[in-house]
């Protein structure tokens, strides 16, 4: 693996050719990973899927990805994942930066996400990026059979709200 400053990295849109690699990463990172159907449904629904590819030992590999859903003046980040071998190289921040650019191009005012209450590292990353904790969803994530975990809801203001029509501001 290369040092972060010398990584050859590029963003790519979703391609079914990377499907198995994405599933392998998803299953290696999460105790309750997305299913193949979750990814297929996201593609079919037209959600934004961004792959982050790296050059590693002469081969291009998936290092991370995200899935986001566009709404009215907002984007909801549904899944962001960096492969364990590539964590700690700033790739999650790179994915978030690209998502902010994409969201602003669509005139989104807000970026929303949920994160497991126990995932304090991710919460710190999001806070450092500028996200604010705005609430929680009780019993949102599955745990062991019959148990659930709360989600922390976070949001990032991407642009100032538009003045209401007829406003003199």
Can you annotate each of these PLM segments?
Residues 3-4, 10-89, 93-102, 106, ...:
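Acetyl-CoA-dependent GNAT
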Residues 13, 90, 94, 117, ...:
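Residues at secondary-structure transition points
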Residues 41, 118, 141:
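Positions that flank functional sites
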Residues 83-97, 105-106, 110, 116-124, ...:
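Conserved glycine-rich acetyl-CoA-binding loop
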Residues 45-46, 122, 145-146:
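Short Asp/Glu-rich motifs
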Residues 114, 127, 132-150:
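Conserved catalytic-core motifs of GNAT/GCN5-like acyltransferases
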